[in-house]
Amino acid sequence: METKTVAITMGDPAGIGPEIIVKALSEDGLNGAPLVVIGCLATLKCLQAKGITPNVELRAIERVAEARFAPGIIHVIDEPLAQPEALEAGKVQAQAGDLAYRCVKRATELALRGDVQAIATAPLNKEALHLAGHNYPGHTELLATLTHSRDYAMVLYTDKLKVIHVSTHIALRKFLDTLSTTRVETVIGIADTFLKRVGYVKPRIAVAGVNPHAGENGLFGDEETRILTPAITDARAKGMDVYGPCPPDTVFLQAYEGQYDMVVAMYHDQGHIPLKLLGFYDGVNITAGLPFIRTSADHGTAFDIAWTGKAKSESMAVSIKLAMQLA
């Protein structure tokens, strides 16, 4: 059987990414698995020398084909920092943002070429990314640009709750101006395709409303009747099992209890808050709509505890395992 390899990007080297990657890859279930890290080898060795990460072999390779997977070995494709000695833990720095960008770019090239079958990303810092001249709101938009993907969406994934977002990194004031029937219908379709890919035969998809009580028949806003309902009607006409618009304050609990397989959230915090409350340590961020699987730990760079040894690797480990499963 063909070995499916996952590339793991370091994220911002001044954050917890390097630490949680090495910790995760030293665990049972990932130790010796077909995984290749793309990041700054000098940074990884520095953390190891400080006793922050386990004492495993960090083996440099230039190509994925060179890897010989075995317990106790982590294979690294080196993307060096311009000035590794100048890197400061927990600080926003242009060279760190540039490294995070280059790691994602290299991983994308490997995935599109077929050298790896999925990507798992450690968190990057958006301010550092912008400081380096890479003006993307986050991983999702960066990957969409690198792969020329037009229809994509952010999924937050746990065993008991799965959420897909119509919008993500946009100011709430601007969100309503960009909301459209076309976008909502597109995201419903992405959700249906994604769920079928991961094993759901007839996915049940709930669409959350925008307004309190899903508008209460227009009393608290007309977006539900004017924008969401036509999208739901069109999706049903295409054979999708779609429900809503559902009151946002109850639909996530209903999905968590098994009534729906995925919730379509309208904006970033509407979807992120319930999922992080119910699955902070085992939640995985997935970009649906790319030509390959991309997963990510569902948290940020945690600059406040970077390079202290305090970072927990559970979410990173879960995201890598899910990438291996879905690849």
From Swiss-Prot:
Give the residues the record marks as binding a divalent metal cation: 169, 213, 268
How the cofactor binds, per note?
A: Binds 1 divalent metal cation per subunit.
Gene Ontology terms for molecular function: metal ion binding; NAD binding; oxidoreductase activity
* Keywords, ordered alphabetically: Carbohydrate metabolism, Metal-binding, NAD, Oxidoreductase
> Which family does the similarity line name?
Belongs to the PdxA family. PdxA2 subfamily.
Q: How does it assemble?
A: Homodimer.
Q: What class of enzyme is it?
A: oxidoreductase
- For this entry, the protein name equals Putative D-threonate 4-phosphate dehydrogenase
State the PANTHER family in the record.
Answer: 4-HYDROXYTHREONINE-4-PHOSPHATE DEHYDROGENASE (PTHR30004), D-THREONATE 4-PHOSPHATE DEHYDROGENASE (PTHR30004:SF6)
Functionally, this protein is described as follows: Catalyzes the NAD-dependent oxidation and subsequent decarboxylation of D-threonate 4-phosphate to produce dihydroxyacetone phosphate (DHAP).
Instruction: Work out whether the entry's keyword set contains Magnesium.
Output: no
The cofactor required is: a divalent metal cation
Q: What is its EC number?
A: 1.1.1.408
Lineage, opening ranks: Bacteria, Pseudomonadati, Pseudomonadota, Gammaproteobacteria, Enterobacterales
Chain positions recorded as substrate binding sites: 139-140, 276, 285, 294
What reaction does this catalyse? 4-O-phospho-D-threonate + NAD(+) = dihydroxyacetone phosphate + CO2 + NADH
